[in-house]
Amino acid sequence: NIKIILREKGLKDEEYKNQIKWIIPNAQKNCMEPIHLLLEKGGETCPDNPHEGEEFGYVLSGTVQVVLGNRSFKAKKGESFYYDAKYKHYLKSKNGAKVLWISSPPSF
């Protein structure tokens, strides 16, 4: 099944200072969901409660803190992260960042 996507669709969250762009619109029906995440200075994602699945991210620019439960890990430009989503989790960035983020199964 081949899909050609011509543009991303997005959503901006003023409260959390982030913007999510769906790289594959309506990917919720697929096995995985890739998004382009822009964290503004001091931005973060809404904390996500534990759920089944796995998440992967690749930092395109800047630095992010990956918060998993009561632990925190740093990932900078060119680095990636991968985790089981069984812990409460979110990303944050002090100075802003861009991330390619993939969730399986879809959760955005």
What are these regions (language model features)?
Residues N1-K3:
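Short C-terminal boundary/hinge segments that cap the last helix of small helical domains
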Residues E8-G43, P47, I102-S103, S107:
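A short glycine-rich, His/Asp/Glu-containing loop-to-beta-strand
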Residues Y16-N18, K76, A85-F108:
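Ligand-binding loop in jelly-roll beta-barrel domains
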Residues L38-L39, P50-V66:
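Short, conserved beta-strand element in jelly-roll/cupin
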Residues T45-H51, L91-S93:
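Short histidine-centered beta-strand/loop micro-motifs
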Residues E54, S61-T63, N70, K86-K88, ...:
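A generic structural motif
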Residues G69-A85:
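Short acidic-glycine-tyrosine-enriched beta hairpin
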